[in-house]
Amino acid sequence: MYRPLIAVFFFLLLVFTVILVRSPKADLIVVGVIWTGETDRPFVEAMAIKGDRIMTIGFRDEVMSFSGKNTEIIELGKELVVPGFIDTHVHFLQGGLNLASVQLRDATTPEEFANRIAEFAKSVPPGTWILGGDWDHENWGGELPHRDWIDELTKDHPVFVTRLDGHMSLANSKALALAGVGNDVEDIDGGSIVRESDGRLTGIFKDNAERLIQMHIPEPSDYEVDMGLRLAMEYVASHGVTSVHDMNAMLDGMRRARSNGQQLTRYYGVYSLSRWEMVRDMVNREGNGDEW
């Protein structure tokens, strides 16, 4: 009677040993305060990761059993680990291109505003449009910028830099000339053009009026798209954002990033309702996408 039990015991021990020996080892083990999202166990001490999958979570000693000679271990102490954030409304390419352009968000005086544009102009070839900026005129008391601030500094570059909320932009005289916009231009519905008392344009265009200049700005090249998306992905990853819903879908650029092994962000491209037939045909042809 005892011999069969002993045989079964040693058989189970052998199986358990084989399982331990053959159990996959983690590529990465993270130790810290890890939030799980589970009501009955909201926090654990560690998690093991292999490839792009979480193998297990639990107490430190439990998870460390998945450690091998090539396992990287990150000790975070009391730092908090949470799932990646999802931003459901972004303009991803525009954000990335802005990161590559002149930075005006924290300019605190008209002089600093103008000098930053001038310095950036020196770094790009003549004729290059200077865009983005994300300026905030409230930083220097509320006076709107004027094209006279930058015209002498940007004679070789058309400039159309935008306020941080996107609702107004400043054009220099070269941009106005390329767009064929003069002092006699009429206001358009849903927008306004700021003028001096004698009717001379200051260079500020608001809301729908911005289109008078925007329609003359060249589309970004594939190189610029790829650079902008890369910068955007790196930036959001540095802030814990792992998925985005892009209001201006750039699927071709993201496909290139994917094929080159450079995609860092899960991506959902959003199209306007007016393009539903194009989206339908694309889904019928290519499917709904994959996990990325």
What are these language model-derived features?
Residues 1-4:
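Positively charged n-region of N-terminal signal peptides that target proteins for export
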Residues 6-18:
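Hydrophobic membrane-insertion alpha-helices, especially the h-region
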Residues 23-31, 35, 39-284, 290:
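Divalent metal-binding segments
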